[in-house]
């Protein structure tokens, strides 16, 4: 690759991520791995550096402006530092224990089977609309204790608010209305759970808030929103993007179909390949130096997971989709104290959907042989918007 000087770019450019960000990110990673963009925002693009920063959460703070650039920290664990972060995480983790996931497995498999059966019976479907979107929405809706009749509006609120998460300048009337409607809705739910607690996660959060955990109603609202948005967007995009990669590389799908062990490795490669959360931002609480580059106190520093998951120092042929890749030290779920709590649920959903799809089909192909994916116009998440396929 030619070592030409890249014109300074906006590391949060939506157009770049919607199109093909990888040539630009590769140049940055190879030439200026600790990169300051045209707006003065820093970016870490290598796994070693991101792990270092994430382990030093007291220096690379999440609670100053929150997890999004130029933002305002919200009352949720993702936008908090210890000890508040640890207190909130301890409570939310009650919904994601190994015992909880083991108990939940049969139900997740049943939901996946129902969705796949309906799609395969028609001989064709849009993976996003018919499988990848409804699976996590159903499961997250249940965890929130929401009736099925509310799933569509919860989905709309989630999609709208994630669209405004890139930067405050993208907060439109639709985003504001969605936030207001969600806040009104979840506030009513919280009041109900105070009187009628159940087994759902909102009830667990409410009980913890009343038991002096350091949380209050605002933290319940914020963490329920985190569950809704995070649980929806990430799994949907990996189901879709992983399957798109396997269809485009049929020899890789053949390997993934062979055994449960092969599928597990394939899932990890799908996570690396898609990297559904592009980045998180931290703010430095003191002057720091990485790779000889000095980053001043008070700087916004992007953890660019999308760039890091193609790191040449960590992956052989990083731009090749290889379901046999092992080990696969990706950071699709982040790293350190803010490692995604829902990782085990996401893997369970991916395993369930792919298992059912492979079990019920001989082939999965693009409905249109000339299909090319259209990605979300965003710099926080990156996902395929529609994936029409046909089955045999």
Q: Can you say where each PLM-predicted feature lies in the sequence?
A:
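Cytochrome P450
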Residues: 1-392
